[in-house]
């Protein structure tokens, strides 16, 4: 009888991928990135172990918001104080902090536990014109448009 394969944290090979977000819909980009961060694209995927890879997203300010999401979709956060609810439209968030828009979208597709937070730390987002600091890792290009 065969036993089920369980990945061990010290045996995991992690790769680096770079993704260009130019003219890619936000949700489709986020779902592919979340899949790679979790490690579900690998045959060694184990749900209780962080088997995912590192992902670098460039040109975050050029991501596409389809439909009326730029004016209708609202992101909320609360300061913890009475009356501290803050709201920001997706279009405004893309203009002022495009990194946060992609990070929030990907984080919403990861598990809501300690493992999901650890997987979210492997995401690095850069707007256009910013210097990518992970070039020493020699990231492989992951073409989202071919996967869609």
Curated annotation (Swiss-Prot):
InterPro entries, per the entry: Ribosomal_uL13 (IPR005822), Ribosomal_uL13_bac-type (IPR005823), Ribosomal_uL13_sf (IPR036899)
GO terms under cellular component: cytosolic large ribosomal subunit
GO molecular function terms attached to this record: mRNA binding; structural constituent of ribosome
CDD domains cross-referenced by the UniProt entry: Ribosomal_L13
Record's keyword terms, sorted: Ribonucleoprotein, Ribosomal protein
Stretch forming the signal peptide: none
Record-linked Gene3D superfamilies: Ribosomal protein L13 (3.90.1180.10)
BP terms from Gene Ontology: negative regulation of translation; translation
NCBIfam families per record: rplM_bact (TIGR01066)
Family: Belongs to the universal ribosomal protein uL13 family.
Quaternary structure and interacting proteins, as annotated: Part of the 50S ribosomal subunit.
Annotated function: This protein is one of the early assembly proteins of the 50S ribosomal subunit, although it is not seen to bind rRNA by itself. It is important during the early stages of 50S assembly.
Name the record gives this protein: Large ribosomal subunit protein uL13
Native source organism of the sequence: Oenococcus oeni (strain ATCC BAA-331 / PSU-1)
Gene name in the database record: rplM
């Amino acid at each position: 009888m065969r036993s089920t394969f369980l990945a061990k944290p010290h045996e995991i090979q992690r790769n680096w991928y770079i993704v260009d977000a130019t003219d890619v819909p936000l949700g489709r980009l986020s779902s592919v990135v979340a899949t790679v961060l979790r490690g579900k694209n690998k045959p060694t995927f184990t749900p209780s172990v962080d088997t995912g890879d590192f992902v670098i997203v460039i040109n975050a300010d050029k991501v596409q918001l389809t439909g009326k999401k730029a004016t209708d979709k609202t992101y909320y956060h609360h300061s913890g104080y009475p009356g501290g609810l803050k709201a920001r439209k997706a279009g405004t968030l893309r203009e002022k902090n495009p990194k946060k828009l992609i990070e929030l979208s990907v984080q919403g597709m990861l598990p809501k536990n300690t493992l999901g937070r650890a997987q979210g730390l492997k995401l690095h987002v850069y707007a256009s014109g910013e210097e990518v600091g992970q070039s020493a890792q020699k990231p492989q290009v992951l073409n989202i448009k071919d996967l869609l």
